[in-house]
């Protein structure tokens, strides 16, 4: 690694001096990150960029599999080489449909971990930490482990999916550099100006009369409809939960005890009270509503509940070979999102 650095410095130093009859210099480097730790990778990248800025007659073209370098170079300097239907394509991200503002947002957002999406065959974008913790476990339960299918899961910490969807799509082509799924909430009943609005102050032990009717008759949010319309093709697909992630999980009867166990792990006093109230209710929708409202009202511990549920599901996955009486059921919209970015196993529908 150090020998390569010395050699690269010598070559670029030589190029920086103008020579008679030579007007342009192109420096081609294959995987300069080889044998270098991340800090040195960043150092050599800055060295390249500084030389290019100081000497207009030098152009550096390098190939790389390093998320460290990709995260620092800037989206407009990235050319993706990808394969689709047994053909190779080149996609300069500068040609994407991203606005300058969206490019700036992505450059600030794409750290070393998230930049791994550029090397993936498939990408799943999620809203927050709960989904980021649990989706990999759900994928294992349906025999689609994400690592086996080269799928990267990206937590965008919000609902600003549009720049990512636009970046994935290659302008003028019906393909993208990867298949992508967006898993998000449809956020119905969130508009204060609509009669179906559900107050943010509502908790699980309040009077819930009429709330289920609001959810049943509520319409997906404008934000959800916008991202669904932007996707609308086979490159990036949007998969939405009815209301929220937690509510959708709890709508499956098998999942109630799993969720209550996870909640009781995090809330040893309040959890049993919730369990008693949920178990006394006959309506599956009301059970799901209580669980969602409980988690929503204690938002600061959502990640802890997800971690507790993740540990429970890991045990279920390990015990699957012995048979599980009431296995956790992955909601259909999440299964569809995972299937979208993974190849179906031969002869297996689910």
Q: What are the functions of these language-model segments?
A:
Residues 23-25, 55-61:
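Loop/turn-to-beta-strand initiation segments
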Residues 11-19, 50-54, 141-144:
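Conserved helix-loop functional segments at active or binding sites
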Residues 73-350:
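Acidic, divalent-metal-binding catalytic cores of TOPRIM
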Residues 21, 34-38, 42, 72:
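Conserved D-loop-proximal element of ABC-family nucleotide-binding domains
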Residues 3, 30-36, 67:
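Catalytic acidic motif of RecA-like/P-loop NTPases
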């Amino acid at each position: 690694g150090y020998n390569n650095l010395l050699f690269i410095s010598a070559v670029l130093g030589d190029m920086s001096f103008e020579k008679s009859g030579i007007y342009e210099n192109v420096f081609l480097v294959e995987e300069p990150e080889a044998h270098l730790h991340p800090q040195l990778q960043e150092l050599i990248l800055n060295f390249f960029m500084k030389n290019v800025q100081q000497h207009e007659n030098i152009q550096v073209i390098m190939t790389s599999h390093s998320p460290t370098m990709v995260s620092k170079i800037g989206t407009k300097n990235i050319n993706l080489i990808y394969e689709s239907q047994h053909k190779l394509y080149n996609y300069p991200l500068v040609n994407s449909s991203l606005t300058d503002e969206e490019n700036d947002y992505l450059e600030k957002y794409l750290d070393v971990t998230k930049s791994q999406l550029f090397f993936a065959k498939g990408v799943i974008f999620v809203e927050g930490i709960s989904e980021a913790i649990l989706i990999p476990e759900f994928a294992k339960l349906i025999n689609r482990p994400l690592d086996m299918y080269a799928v990267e899961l990206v937590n965008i910490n919000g609902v600003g999916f549009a720049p990512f969807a636009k970046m994935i799509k290659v302008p003028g082509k019906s393909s993208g550099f990867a298949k992508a799924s967006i898993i998000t909430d449809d956020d119905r009943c969130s508009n204060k100006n609509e009669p179906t609005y559900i107050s943010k102050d509502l908790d699980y032990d309040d009077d819930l009369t009429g709330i289920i009717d609001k959810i049943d008759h509520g319409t997906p949010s404008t934000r959800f409809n916008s991202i669904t319309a932007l996707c609308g093709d086979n490159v990036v697909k949007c998969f939405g939960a009815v209301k929220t992630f937690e509510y959708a999980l709890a709508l499956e009867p098998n999942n109630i005890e799993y969720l209550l166990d996870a909640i009781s792990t995090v809330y040893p006093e309040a959890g049993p009270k919730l369990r008693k109230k949920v178990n006394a209710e006959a309506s599956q929708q009301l059970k799901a509503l209580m669980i969602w409202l409980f988690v929503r009202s204690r938002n600061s511990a959502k990640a802890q509940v997800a971690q507790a549920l993740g540990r429970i599901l890991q045990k279920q996955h390990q015990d699957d070979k012995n048979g599980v009486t009431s296995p956790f059921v992955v909601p259909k919209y999440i299964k569809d999102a995972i299937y979208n970015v993974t190849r179906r196993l031969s002869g297996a529908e689910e």
